[in-house]
Amino acid sequence: MPIASIALRRGKSASYRRAVADAVHEALVEIVGIPPDDRFQLITELDSDALIYDRNFLGIARSDDIVIIQITLRGGRSRETRVALHRRIADRLANNPGVRPEDVFIVLVENDYADWSVGRGEAPLMRLLDHGEPVSVRPAT
């Protein structure tokens, strides 16, 4: 159950922002294997003075169209899977909405089931971790 935080320069259209969000989600479904309905994303638009980055870090020329993506997800995936996810996100963003691969900056932050509460202050994912029990959330009373 990942959550993706996406930062980009203010002024992009709603369709552009949605295409970025869709590309990230579709890559997670395809490469990580999350269910299609497991979608939690935050898009933050920033003015140029609040989006600070090195335009040539490690020799990669970045433009004003940089997209910074931080994905928090449960740990344990192989290095190959993580690298494949980076590549697939960059490829999908290049395809639609046309983000240059040089402008795609991704960081994965891994954690544990105990770090997630998906509603009502409950942590049902811990049951899976602690007891191997199926994950379900009881109806609200």
State the predicted function of each range.
Residues 1-141:
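Interaction-mediating elements
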